[in-house]
Amino acid sequence: MIQISDTAKSHFLKLIQREGVPGMGVRLSAVDPGTPRADARLEFADPSELVGDEWLIDCGDFTLYVASASVAWLDGAEIDYVTQATGSQQLIIKAPKIKGQELSQVASLVERVCWVVENEINPQLASHGGRVEVQEVSAEGVVLLRFGGGCHGCGMADVTLKQGVEKTLMDRVHGVIAVRDATDHSTGAAPYISRDFSP
């Protein structure tokens, strides 16, 4: 169920009335659901632009259309239009399921490692234009990773591996005993910090 505050409904209605298109509503969809970059998208929805499988939420004077593929990701979402302490107004969408839910301990070791890499480690590495990819997880709990982007060839990759990636995986995923780097760092085209760097 998606909750829409009265202030959000009033805000949408004003915007729709400005457009002056009969039957216009608002479409809500999830973009990149189940990933760390997931986001909710709101846009005007002209009746001729609808696919036909949208879920409809009657908001009184207009309809909110929810993309069918997004329904599960947006279940429990709240849409509000609030006045900030500064006096400015802001539309707020809270969608607690949009980025996915952490896997339980009954998930396989590989699934849990991949989840932590995608949802916790890669978002941090992205600030440097980097990422890691899981190559293999052995039955013994040794994780083999390959660095990419700004981490490929970076002079700090060893530190990132030991103090960041390995520590996070060993703390967060029961069963991981070691993390190894399978990257050939000599081939890195645009490292965040060159391996030749000396302060």
Swiss-Prot record:
Binds 1 [4Fe-4S] cluster per subunit. The cluster is presumably bound at the interface of two monomers. GO terms for molecular function: 4 iron, 4 sulfur cluster binding; iron ion binding. The keyword Signal does not apply. Keywords: 4Fe-4S, Iron, Iron-sulfur, Metal-binding. GO terms for biological process: iron-sulfur cluster assembly; protein maturation. The keyword Transmembrane helix does not apply. Its cofactor is [4Fe-4S] cluster. [4Fe-4S] cluster binds at residues 151, 154. InterPro entries: Fe/S_biogenesis_protein_NfuA, FSCA_dom_sf, HesB-like_dom_sf, NIF_FeS_clus_asmbl_NifU_C. It holds the Pfam family NifU. HAMAP family: Fe_S_biogen_NfuA (MF_01637). Homodimer. Belongs to the NfuA family. Involved in iron-sulfur cluster biogenesis. Binds a 4Fe-4S cluster, can transfer this cluster to apoproteins, and thereby intervenes in the maturation of Fe/S proteins. Could also act as a scaffold/chaperone for damaged Fe/S proteins. This is Fe/S biogenesis protein NfuA. It comes from Xylella fastidiosa (strain Temecula1 / ATCC 700964).
